[in-house]
Design a protein with these regions (language model features):
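Conserved pre-motif I regulatory segment
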Residues: 1-27
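Walker A/P-loop
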Residues: 20-41, 241, 265
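Conserved Walker A/P-loop ATP-binding site and its immediately adjacent core
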Residues: 36-37, 46-71, 245-246
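Conserved helix/coil segment N-terminal to the catalytic DExD/H
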Residues: 83-114, 125, 129-130
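Conserved RecA-like P-loop NTPase helicase motor core
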Residues: 98, 267-362, 367
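Post-DEXD/H (motif II) to motif III coupling segment of the RecA-like Helicase ATP-binding lobe
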Residues: 121-186
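Conserved helicase ATPase core of P-loop NTP-dependent helicases/translocases
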Residues: 63, 79-88, 249-256, 260-296
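Conserved interdomain linker/interface between the two RecA-like ATPase lobes of SF2 helicase motors
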Residues: 166-239
């Protein structure tokens, strides 16, 4: 398989970092092809008789990623360790973290030369730590690499205990400009509750979603959500994010009352039922899927071209994950009758106002630098990790590199970017009360 240029660069940079540090994390947005990149990295570094462990946190991803891996590396055998199968024979073993972290499975685990963690912002969780510690007990020289779109966790905990460097970061804006993701067409819609949402209490991980439900889950607001959706995206496959299960059910019911084929997915939805619903969404039997936070990760349905946010996001990473579900491009061979030029984002929760752009960092160089040897890096003053030179935020501890590039950034914005012409946001005042522009 031929990698895209940015994928090849990311794989090369990760390999260089592994030679130096024995660990690294790669930051790449939804749609960048993380599974392809991790597969290519394994293939690049694989040696005869090596054992590689690939860890996923969702059941449906284990076999999906193993199949993609085999297309990239047909000469490296794979096997599965999950709730229904325990096969340790493969040269590359794909496993679900919940299964592998159980004591009896840890006891049967073989020695590994490399561990790859998908959605690696979860790597400091207790279940992952049990696995990593056992792997290191068996082989202290094991290489550990992580791939994630959102390294900055909502709870602000750093990843330093697992990764001491970020070898490469791919930005959403870059992939949109190069045609590998579609651009978001974003509408921030005021339904008269903006001030109330801004005053919602924060918890450790997010806003208090019970309070959000009391503000947002009203028949009049739900009707407005459907009306605006019909006006701006009524012919599009859509994923809706709500605050609670009750909120999601009420929004789903409102869609159905409007004769829209809609289903709900929650954390309690059985795995097979969820797979069927998402299959039906992708293939046109369902138009809208309403969920709480189930579809923020590990969900791949390229025909989805509308994202509706009926809740605020206290952390930028959550917003990026949600909107990212709609930015994938279409493979004409898989979906020959689907045309997708952009993704409509309807933000009723004012997340866009809070967080702005989807990119976590800004490239102050203004043009792609010529690569020769190792990618340029800088040292984070907070945790001493190596991170890409262009990063505005440390992927390991969350430190913001604000002051160093402020003057250059202001010059860049003022001279190179017409924010009025290029802004993806549009305000809509539904109540003519002057609270929107």
């Amino acid at each position: 398989m031929i990698l895209r240029p940015y994928q090849e660069i990311a794989v090369d940079d990760a390999s260089i970092a592994l030679n130096k540090h024995k660990n690294t994390i790669v930051v790449a947005p939804t749609g960048a092809g993380k599974t392809i990149m991790l597969s290519a990295l394994i293939g690049k570094r694989y040696k005869k008789n090596n054992k590689v462990l690939v860890i996923q946190h969702r059941d449906e991803l284990v076999r999906q990623n193993a199949e993609k891996f085999s297309r990239v590396n047909p000469n490296i055998s794979t096997s599965i360790v999950d709730g229904s199968e325990k096969d340790w024979s493969g040269q590359s073993i794909f496993s679900m973290v919940q299964t592998l972290s159980r004591p009896n499975n840890l006891d049967n685990m073989c020695k590994f030369d490399m561990v790859v963690i998908d959605e690696s912002h979860h790597a400091i969780a207790e279940t992952y730590q049990r696995i990593i510690n056992r792997v290191k007990e068996a082989n202290n020289s094991v290489e550990i690499v992580g791939f994630t779109a959102t390294p900055n966790r909502g709870d602000k905990k750093g990843l330093k205990t697992v990764f001491n460097n970020c070898s490469h970061q791919i930005e959403i804006g870059t992939l949109i400009r190069e045609g590998f993701l579609v651009p978001p067409k974003t509408f921030v819609i005021d339904v008269g509750v903006t001030e109330d949402l801004q005053n919602v209490r924060r918890t450790v991980s997010d806003f208090d979603m019970g309070e959000v439900e009391r503000i947002m889950n009203k028949r009049a607001i739900n009707e407005k959500v459907i009306d605006e959706w019909k006006d701006k995206a009524g012919d599009r496959k859509t994923v809706v994010f709500c605050s609670t299960v009750v909120h999601a059910q009420d929004v789903c019911d409102e869609y159905r009352r409007s004769n829209v084929r809609a289903e709900i997915v929650t954390g309690e939805t059985p795995s097979e039922e969820r797979k069927q619903i998402l299959h039906d969404l992708e293939h046109g039997d369902i138009q809208v899927v309403v969920n709480v936070a189930v579809l923020t990760e590990g969900f791949d349905a390229p025909p989805v071209s509308c994202i509706v946010l009926t809740r605020p996001c206290s952390y930028k990473s959550t917003m990026v994950q949600m909107i990212g579900r709609g930015l994938r491009t279409i493979d004409p061979e898989e979906h020959p009758n689907v045309i997708k030029k952009d993704c409509v984002v309807l933000d009723f929760g004012t997340s866009v106002l809070t967080h702005g752009s989807l990119d976590e960092g800004v490239n102050l160089e203004g043009a792609e630098a010529q690569r020769s040897g190792e990618a340029p890096v800088k040292i984070c003053p907070s945790c001493q990790s190596e991170v890409p030179l262009s990063s505005r935020e440390c992927a390991i501890c969350g430190h913001e590199f604000g002051a160093e590039g402020k003057e250059a950034l202001e010059d860049f914005v003022m001279t190179e970017v017409d924010l009025m012409d290029r802004s993806p946001f549009r305000w809509i005042d539904l109540f003519n009360n002057g609270r929107c522009m």
